[in-house]
Amino acid sequence: FIEIKSANPLVAPLIQPNYLSTEIDVQEILEGTRLLRKLAKSPPLAKIIESEIHPGQNVQTDDELMAYIRETAGTVYHPVSTCKMGPNASSDVVDNQLRVHGLYGLRVVDASIFPTVTSGNTNAPTIMVGEKAADIILSAHGEKNI
């Protein structure tokens, strides 16, 4: 969740991403960890990987892996997908014109409208969102009126 802490726009919001808070999150990270271990033991990589450093071969069970992951997991500080786009005001934040449901004159134009995080840096897709938003706003108000 995101919580606005102040009316001052310079005060950062509280962002609680709820990492690993659902069973599907846990299962996906465990599956990914197992896949990485399997790849590391494949003939091409086994030639150059002497041993697993972290979490180490002594960490094997799902509970042990999750304990390690919960203790060491971090973020790359590219929060996205916090303002779902859709037509339903009760479950979505913005419509397809980037307007916030229920608030006149407010649009969200940033990475928070992404449906999922991109596999690379968020800068270029965020610029594309901005460009699309500019087109939407110009179209809505008429280019000559802006």
Describe each PLM feature range:
Residues 1-125, 133-146:
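FAD-dependent oxidoreductase catalytic-site/capping-region signature
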